[in-house]
Amino acid sequence: TKIAGGVGIFLLVFLVPFADEIAGRIYFNHLCATEAGVKVYQTVELPTEYWETDGKPKFFNKHGYLEHNFWVKELDESGARVVRHSSIFAIDKRISPVKERSSQKVLAEVTTFLYWGGWMRRNLSPHNTASSCKFTEGPSFSRSFYSQLFKPAASAK
């Protein structure tokens, strides 16, 4: 009976307060793996000035990110929508459109999820920030994503 009591106290003190954190993290990781990602609806053809002679794009900086001036001239990434995906687990869904600046046509959408943590983290942490799906982090995402959006114009090939 001492063992059963000890297990009961363990469950009450540790498992119950953190159960929603554990289940929420599992669900969040599932959403990131199955529903988050990029949808490209339309590509943009760019003239020869944007391409090296070997066909590589000139619009990435040395760190692998899109050049700021190119981004400002060609794209509008405003208008992201955030909706509550799961109230039980405090998970939001963020859909970010990528539009051609001149026409405002939606070229692509990036969908990710934000996890705000379990009850204890949300209510007891003074500076709670959300975790987001990791696929959008770093220059490899930037290079891969924007390389899907832009291609050489027929005359540039």
PLM regions: where:
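N-terminal export/targeting and maturation segments
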Residues: 5-68
